[in-house]
A protein has these predicted regions:
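Second RecA-like catalytic domain
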Residues: 1-246, 250
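A positional "C-terminalness" feature that preferentially activates on distal terminal regions of long
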Residues: 109-127, 132-134, 150-153, 244, ...
Length: 308
């Protein structure tokens, strides 16, 4: 009878864990909706915003319990937000009444589409030396580690190899990321590197099996941002005149007519990222090719220089 009760208890405990796990991932899906799941940071921002609304209603305890959030951590974040608002008000003069109301508002409204893009660019700027790219995009040898059955359409990032600046070997998206059950993005910035623990203990004379490296706190970025935000980490190709343009000839004619004081031309430049690093340079020091961009050059003292 005791054995039967133990078995029943174990089955009930297992069912309870399954239900809790299901509820946990459902809560994550709700918070992942902010920004269409383009950053793990947005998940945190969504939690903080939801907590601020519930705190005003006096239901913060229930919110934390139902959404698997630590109440003490949320209270500290809530207080820190208020402190930062006070610092901004004390150090920035000329704020409008609307801006002051926004800073003093304990509720945190959700960012709009434009603000979401600005936040992604801000995160890209912060982590510009922590860029990762899907291995197949840049033709890295690590791409061969991808499952053969995946083909060109990838439903999730599971076992999809990436290469990351300054991190040797293949890296993978961590299972806790909002990207894990989504199609794998091409370019990311990451906040943390996590190394898995070995599953089996190795003997003294046995070589330890290589550990899997995961990336956490990820944000999807546009590779066209990189050469602007991380210029010092990029190298640039020789300029080529933009095809199909007559800017130079038009500039010469305008110069002859006295309508312009300098010669100008439109060019195309191809940047490469990460190749200039002495340690851990991307693609063996060659860098990863980024999208080409158009620029305007001005002739100054006999030399063409980019117009900023």
């Amino acid at each position: 009878l005791a054995l039967k009760m133990t078995a029943e208890n174990q089955a009930q405990a297992k069912e309870l864990r399954r239900a809790m796990r299901s509820a946990y991932f459902k809560a994550l899906q709700v918070f992942d909706a902010l920004g269409d799941g383009q950053s793990d940071v947005f998940r945190l921002l969504s939690v903080v915003g939801a907590y601020s609304h519930e705190a005003l209603r006096g239901s913060s305890v229930a919110f934390c319990r139902d959404n698997f959030v630590r109440q003490k951590a949320m209270e500290e974040i809530h207080k820190l937000r208020a402190q930062l608002s006070n610092v901004v008000q004390a150090n920035l003069s000329g704020l409008s009444e609307r801006q002051l109301r926004q800073l003093q508002n304990p509720s945190l409204p959700a960012p709009n589409a434009v603000q979401i893009k600005v936040l992604r660019q801000l995160l890209a700027s912060i982590y510009i030396d922590r860029v990762a790219v899907r291995a197949d995009i840049v033709g890295a040898p690590e791409a061969e580690l991808a499952p053969a059955a995946q083909g060109t359409k990838m439903a999730s990032t599971r076992r999809v190899p990436y290469v990351a600046l300054g991190v040797p070997g293949p890296v993978y998206i961590h299972t806790s990321s909002t990207f894990y059950h989504r199609p794998p993005p091409e370019w990311l910035v990451f906040g943390e590197v996590y190394q898995s623990a070995p599953k089996d203990a190795s003997l003294d004379n046995e070589e330890e099996k290589p550990r899997t490296i995961f990336l956490k706190m990820l944000t999807k970025i546009n590779p066209a941002w990189i050469h602007t935000l991380g210029r010092s980490l990029c190298t640039f190709s020789q300029t080529t005149e933009e095809p199909g343009t007559s800017a130079l000839s038009d500039s010469i004619k305008a110069l002859k007519r006295g309508e312009r004081s300098s010669l100008q031309r439109h060019v195309v430049i191809t940047p490469r990222y990460g190749g200039s690093l002495q340690d851990g340079g991307a693609a063996g020091g060659q860098g990863w090719e980024l999208p080409a961009f158009s620029a305007k050059q001005v002739l100054v003292n006999g030399r063409w220089s980019l117009q900023t």
